[in-house]
Amino acid sequence: VVDGPAIVLYMSHLGLGLVRALGREGVRVFALDPHRDALGMNSRYCTPVVTPDIKADEARYLDFLLEFGCARPSKPVLYPTGDPTVVLLSREREALSRYYHFVMP
């Protein structure tokens, strides 16, 4: 059983759907996106967090995720919603697993 919050990466239509589904179940959700006005960042079911842009600076994005995860009192679950985040999480899983749970194999 995971007691940490959910971290939804990128607020596309898929991200918004995840935020709503998790939030309606009482899960605390952080919505991460480089654009404050992205779809889903204003949902009542999440706390919006503006991040570096993974496409512009992947290393900075990874550093942000590591720092954000380290600051949580319990391990959050990462929900990637796009190819760039899936690729990064797959490649950097070992480093990120110190601070996060994963929903992907």
Roles of regions detected by a PLM:
Residues 10, 33, 49-56, 105:
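Short beta->alpha connector loops at strand-helix junctions that form conserved
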Residues 48-68:
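Glycine-rich, highly charged phosphate/nucleotide-binding loops
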Residues 31-46:
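Short, glycine/polar-rich helix-capping loops at beta-to-alpha or helix-loop-helix junctions
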Residues 2-6:
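Extreme N-terminal starter segment of soluble prokaryotic enzymes
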Residues 26-30:
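Hydrophobic anchor at the start of a short beta-strand
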Residues 50-51, 71-105:
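A short, GP-enriched loop/loop-strand-helix hinge that lies immediately N-terminal to
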Residues 17-24, 69, 93:
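Surface-exposed amphipathic alpha-helices with a cationic face
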